Amino acid sequence: LSRGLGDVYKRQGWEYSNGMVADVDAIRYDAEGRIANLQTLGYREGLHKLSLGIGFSDVVRAAYRDVGTPWGYTLWAGYDLNPENRNFSDLVSAYARIYTPGFFRHNSLSVAAAYQTSVGGYRFPSGLRFLGYKSTRLLPRGFSSSDISSNNYLAGSVDYQFPLCYPEGGISGVIYFKRIRLNVGADYARFQEFGSRGKTWRDIYSYGGDLLLDLNILRMSAAATATVKLSLYKPSEGSCWFGFGLELPF
């Protein structure tokens, strides 16, 4: 269930989820400090996440051939907690993105930064740190939330986007191919992990690009443009990451 209040430029609200959460109070440990009853731990119902957030965004409307807004920015801050079980740590997170024109006409450059960290200390046992909350607003592409820790997590991202061509044709009344564009991006993140040697810093990064096809389907207006997106990124750990997506105008 979620609730929000705002207009085009300013948004603020709260959100909570009510479902199944691990019963951390029932955990038992063996003589070596490992969880002994993980397979039979079980779950319980109840409110297990409350999210508070506030954001502000202001952008300039893009021209017909622009690949993105020429000027703009987005700011957001959030706070996540578990009011039903205070064994969990809270999460503070912030995000910002700036949009500027590129080096050539109709190009676009955007730079983003994010920060998140757990507060209140790990009140639950160290073996359960994986249950802590994490923000996914800015993850290096090719990584997931399971690859990071929300301890002094700092991330940055740079994207440069430009048009390749404008087919401006298709099958009348069925599909209209508007534009093919390319986005080149790079991401970096640094955060702290807890191990046998205490706190250590870990760095991850990725780089690659996205091929995007803008199209209109079934006589939709020019403003109602859908986008087919193909992504290929090389993360600093593991093999190449490939993604496919469809962005709809609603």
Where do the protein language model's features map onto the residues?
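Outer-membrane beta-barrel "beta-signal"
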Residues: 51-54, 208-211, 239-250
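Outer-membrane beta-barrel transmembrane domain signature
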Residues: 25, 181-217
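C-terminal outer-membrane beta-barrel translocator/porin domains of Gram-negative envelope proteins
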Residues: 27-184, 192-194, 244-246
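A subset of solvent-exposed loop/turn segments in beta-rich extracellular surface proteins, enriched
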Residues: 12, 16-32
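Single conserved hydrophobic/aromatic residue that forms the stacking wall/gate
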Residues: 1-9
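Long, low-hydrophobicity, solvent-exposed regions enriched in small/turn-prone and acidic residues
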Residues: 7, 15-16, 116, 190
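A structural signal for short secondary-structure junctions
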Residues: 69, 149-152, 174-180, 201-205, ...
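Transmembrane beta-barrel architecture of outer-membrane proteins
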Residues: 14-18, 90-92, 154, 205
